[in-house]
Amino acid sequence: MNTAQSALQPEQLTAAGFAPFGIVVEPFAAPGQPGALPPAGARAINGGTTWRLDLTHNLELDHAGGKPGLAVYSASARQFPMALKVLERHAAGSQSFLPLTGARFVVVVAAPGPAPAAAALRAFITTGQQGVVLNPGTWHHALLAVEAGSFAVLERHPSTAGSGADCEFTALAAAVWLALPGADV
């Protein structure tokens, strides 16, 4: 790595840290488990054996004639450190990444608005039990799997030819190096 280039190390993904960019989706204890408390807004279903927490208020999938699209991505593990060169965003809809196989991933994001500078980037590493819902317009890097795994991806798809694709790309002015915690950069 050229030390004159920017270096970015991910922080642990938390709901508070990720709030400007979207929400964190993570498991919580089921009824009857030791210390189990329902998260705020959850309700009991299935005769009290299950807590349900609806997150649909954070999903934007039908803007401008779009419709929900659910896909499964099978991602290879990335090699770190790695150079980040391009970001993307989906201005008309949210995008969710939910690990199906326990694979950790890094999510690199920047606030909606004009194409971001390197200093505006934030990186978060998941536990493998956490997913994210990106707010519409949030700049982000493509999926960065730490371990190979499968992910459910829920996003807005155009419903007709006229409703348009919803993916804009921007090149970073200079490569930003991403390294995992404890790795040499």
Residue map of PLM features:
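Residues that flank catalytic or metal-binding motifs in active/ligand-binding sites
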Residues: 93, 130, 147
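Non-catalytic, conserved peripheral segments adjacent to functional cores
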Residues: 1-123, 158-185
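Conserved metal-binding segment of the jelly-roll/cupin
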Residues: 125-144
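A short beta-strand-loop micro-motif that forms or neighbors metal/cofactor-
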Residues: 138-171
